[in-house]
Amino acid sequence: MTGQHADIAPATGPRIVVLVGGVGGARFLQGVRELLPDAEVSAIVNVGDDVWMHGLRICPDLDTCMYTLGGGIDTERGWGRVGETWHAKEELAAYHAKPDWFGLGDRDLATHLIRTEMLRAGYPLSAVTEALCNRWQPGVKLIPATDDRCETHVVVTDPENPGERRAIHFQEWWVRYRANVETHGFATIGADEAKPAPNVIDLIESADAVLLAPSNPVVSIGAILAVPGIRGALRTTRAKVIGVSGVIDGKPLRGMADECLSVIGVETTAEAVGRHYGARSATGILDGWLIHTTDTAEVPGVEVRSVPLLMTDPPTTAEIVREALDLAGVKW
């Protein structure tokens, strides 16, 4: 299960790096692949959502990208396997196994079993991901932001002990509580000791363009930036860094970006998110910022362009990518 991605031929196009989360990031990558089938595309994927459940290592964003690009995703839900069954979940419930709020599908379970077996055998997550992708042939290189533990936890008022605060895993905050609990902040556990996965920094530094997918700016892109060295590489790369807004008309395209932004005191607008990322000419990471045609934004030091941002299908998404690369000055 080792070796190079068989589906990635020697690149003849530009070298593109994309920072991505789960559903939105995966759909954006479909557009990148649609537009640039011969390019060297490397996706640096959020691992802040990763969690141990029932003795297995779950990597939601890596799996969503892998299944989406490999044709195995449940397109109606946007996550998990198509044709999924839930017998293992039912059996765990019969045993009163905890936690009972996080379901693992039968098909999905196989991925987690293989991943956990390889991790326990000593393989780093990046090598495990490469091995899993040999089956799915995603057409882009999927790389975890780090091989180390770097999990997003959420500081909340303890629902069971009012008046007391405690930190819970992001999955519990979102899946169990649906963010409907008094929330005080986010913490990235392990970030102080984490290192970028192999080649991540080199890929950013040698890229022709770096794109920030329209993923959650706090717990997806933000969690990637929490890995020491990645933000610095974005600030010094020779490539232009172009972000794509995941907020349209004051609402996230999907997911809970509004809930997360509220916690850190950022408005749910394209302008506010662009300012949150900031300009590379100051202390931020952006050179350019794509917003939807119905939005307006002024981000000091950042070139803002209004284009249609609804990712209805890969060809439509490819046009978003085209605009991002044009803003980056990349020709192919």
From Swiss-Prot:
Class of this enzyme: transferase
InterPro entries, A to Z: CofD, CofD-like_dom_sf, FbiA/CofD
EC number: 2.7.8.28
Positions in coiled-coil regions: none
Cofactor: Mg(2+)
Annotated SUPFAM superfamilies: CofD-like
Catalytic reaction list: enolpyruvoyl-2-diphospho-5'-guanosine + 7,8-didemethyl-8-hydroxy-5-deazariboflavin = dehydro coenzyme F420-0 + GMP + H(+)
Keywords: Magnesium, Transferase
Chain sites annotated for binding 7,8-didemethyl-8-hydroxy-5-deazariboflavin: D63
GO biological process, one term: F420-0 metabolic process
UniProt-listed NCBIfam families: F420_cofD
Family: Belongs to the CofD family.
Subunit structure, interactors included: Homodimer.
Protein name: Phosphoenolpyruvate transferase
Organism name: Nocardia farcinica (strain IFM 10152)
